[in-house]
Each structure stands twice: as C-alpha cells, then as structure tokens.
Amino acid sequence: MSKNNLNETESKIEIEAKVVELLSNDKFKVELPNKKTIIAYVSGKIRINNIRILPGDKVRIELSPYYPTQARITYRFK
C-alpha cells in the first residue's frame, strides 16, 4: 500500500465567508468573497462544542480542490 505524499491539510483551501441561510441537517448556505454561494456543513469540533451559527455570521471554511461546491465550516468569528 503506497501513501500519497500530499498531506490532506495542505490540499485544502481556507477562505472567510458569510453565512446567508440556514438549511436542514447542520448545513448552511455561505457567500464567498467573490459573491458566489455554496453549501457548507459544520465540522465535528463545532458540533461537539455546541457553537451556534446564525445568518450574518462570518466563518472560516475549508474548500476541497476536488469538490469546490461543498465546504466545511471550521471556525466562527466573534
């Protein structure tokens, strides 16, 4: 079994975004700085610590270069 030399965290793209709308199952519609909207889901640490995310909040998201229409919310700014 060979492992890929590229680390998963190095291939992720981190961007600040704004939450526009709440969707079901802890998913959110977020707006990127280029005014494009994508679907984002909550990371496990945010879910475990019961951090509430509301429309209008600024968040940090991780985008995968392989699936750029879906993101993961990793941090909510105060």
UniProtKB/Swiss-Prot annotation:
Keyword field contains Cytoplasm: yes
Disulfide bonds, paired cysteine numbers: none
Gene3D superfamilies hit by this protein: Nucleic acid-binding proteins
Annotated signal sequence range: none
SUPFAM superfamilies (alphabetical): Nucleic acid-binding proteins
Keyword rRNA-binding: yes
InterPro entries recorded: NA-bd_OB-fold, RNA-binding_domain_S1_IF1, TIF_IF1
GO molecular function, one term: translation initiation factor activity
Pfam family membership, one: eIF-1a
Gene Ontology cellular component annotations, sorted alphabetically: cytosol
Keywords (A to Z) from UniProt: Cytoplasm, Initiation factor, Protein biosynthesis, RNA-binding, rRNA-binding
S1-like domain residues: 2-78
Subunit-level organization: Component of the 30S ribosomal translation pre-initiation complex which assembles on the 30S ribosome in the order IF-2 and IF-3, IF-1 and N-formylmethionyl-tRNA(fMet); mRNA recruitment can occur at any time during PIC assembly.
UniProt record similarity statement: Belongs to the IF-1 family.
Function summary: One of the essential components for the initiation of protein synthesis. Stabilizes the binding of IF-2 and IF-3 on the 30S subunit to which N-formylmethionyl-tRNA(fMet) subsequently binds. Helps modulate mRNA selection, yielding the 30S pre-initiation complex (PIC). Upon addition of the 50S ribosomal subunit IF-1, IF-2 and IF-3 are released leaving the mature 70S translation initiation complex.
Protein name: Translation initiation factor IF-1
Taxonomic source organism: Aster yellows witches'-broom phytoplasma (strain AYWB)
